[in-house]
């Protein structure tokens, strides 16, 4: 009822983003028997605009989003837990059959380099092995660049100046 709209009737509104994205929102909602109807905004910018509108009006919104993004930091969005992702839950066949009923998989930072890098540039190879950038690290940077429109090099310099101990450990 809290999320219901005229278009969703007695069901809550679940804001989907671009329907061309790979997503299982409708399947997850149906398979978990949740009282929501998915309404797609049509694009990422339209979703952000809808989020801006809802937050400004102090209206609740339930939506699919991902992290790290500036919107997560700007609005301090919280994750609504779903059953944990598993390979079994989201197999190709489950997706094909509309049987997905779990959370999305976590994206992990993967670092790739030439197999010759360790030999040809051992200092670069060592740096890449030590380098880490967490979601929280990125969430601290994204709003400055994406929302406040600060130049990316200025945002990066600010992070470098404030995190000397972090990046020196990578060298």
Which sequence ranges carry the predicted segments?
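C-terminal functional modules
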Residues: 131-171
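Conserved, surface-exposed functional patches that form binding/active-site neighborhoods
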Residues: 94-110, 121-123
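Metal- and O2-centered redox machinery and metal/ROS homeostasis
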Residues: 2-5, 27-37, 46, 54-60, ...
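Ligand-binding pocket segment of bilobal, Venus flytrap-like solute-binding proteins
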Residues: 12-93
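A conserved helix-loop-strand patch within extracytoplasmic ligand-binding domains
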Residues: 1-15
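A bilobed periplasmic-binding-protein/Venus flytrap-type ligand-binding module shared by bacterial periplasmic
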Residues: 106-120, 141-144
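Short amphipathic alpha-helical coupling segments at ligand-binding clamshell hinges
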Residues: 120-131
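Extracellular/periplasmic catalytic domains that process cell-envelope and extracellular macromolecules
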Residues: 7-9, 56-57, 73, 103-105, ...
């Amino acid at each position: 009822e809290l999320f219901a709209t005229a278009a969703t009737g007695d069901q809550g509104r679940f804001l989907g983003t671009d329907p061309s994205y790979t997503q299982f929102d409708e399947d997850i909602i149906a398979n978990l028997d949740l009282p929501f109807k998915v309404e797609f905004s049509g694009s990422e910018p339209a979703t952000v605009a809808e989020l801006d509108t809802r937050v400004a009006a102090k209206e609740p919104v339930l939506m699919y989003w991902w992290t790290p993004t500036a919107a997560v930091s700007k609005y301090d969005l919280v994750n609504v837990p779903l059953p944990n992702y598993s390979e079994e839950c989201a197999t190709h066949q489950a997706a094909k059959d509309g049987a997905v009923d779990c959370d999305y998989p976590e994206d992990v930072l993967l670092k790739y380099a030439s197999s010759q890098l360790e030999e040809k540039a051992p200092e670069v190879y060592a740096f890449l092995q030590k380098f880490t950038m967490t979601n929280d690290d990125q969430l601290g940077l994204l709003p400055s660049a994406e929302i406040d429109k600060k130049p990316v090099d200025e945002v990066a310099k600010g992070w470098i100046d404030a995190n000397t101990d972090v990046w020196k450990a990578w060298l």
